[in-house]
């Protein structure tokens, strides 16, 4: 995991079957890569059984931010994805404590999820404080990538947006460098207050250390 993310310190256990059936899915990378058609589409209809605005968070960790959104917006649906299971167990605990019916967590490699999202299925995408993974051998694991932006351009509804926050200047610069290749996306600098309706653990953590937090609202351009 990236800096500041320490799932090994979380003393949590896997949710019992009846809770997992409601809130948790595990999509193994090998199966998702070779037989993606065996997994449901990542859409409100595909995962919740009804149509509603859907927000997807990549790297949701313990689900603190996404659960707060789900509680505040009961008529929308929310899906959190993380490549590490233990933080998601804590996320499920939060969802249970809030008796939330509009949220689901998926243990999976986000990069393999892109292909399972139908066109124009998402109202918004959240990518807040992703690990920079700047060592050379980790470059192919970056969530800030052409593949992410290609996914956003295809899967966001017109007027939908990707909310991006980072405390890492190189990651912010990389996002700005990649965006011109995607004319269907329009990026606008945005303050933390504009993008984050709630301060997550990592938001508080990096702000407390005095790090500068930069944000972009990356909107899917309305079609003519």
Swiss-Prot record:
The keyword Lipid metabolism does not apply. It comes from the Bacteria. One of its GO terms (biological process) is tRNA methylation. It catalyses: guanosine(46) in tRNA + S-adenosyl-L-methionine = N(7)-methylguanosine(46) in tRNA + S-adenosyl-L-homocysteine. One of its GO terms (molecular function) is tRNA (guanine(46)-N7)-methyltransferase activity. Belongs to the class I-like SAM-binding methyltransferase superfamily. TrmB family. Catalyzes the formation of N(7)-methylguanine at position 46 (m7G46) in tRNA. This is tRNA (guanine-N(7)-)-methyltransferase. It comes from Chloroflexus aurantiacus (strain ATCC 29366 / DSM 635 / J-10-fl). The lineage of its organism: Bacteria, Bacillati, Chloroflexota, Chloroflexia, Chloroflexales. The gene is trmB.
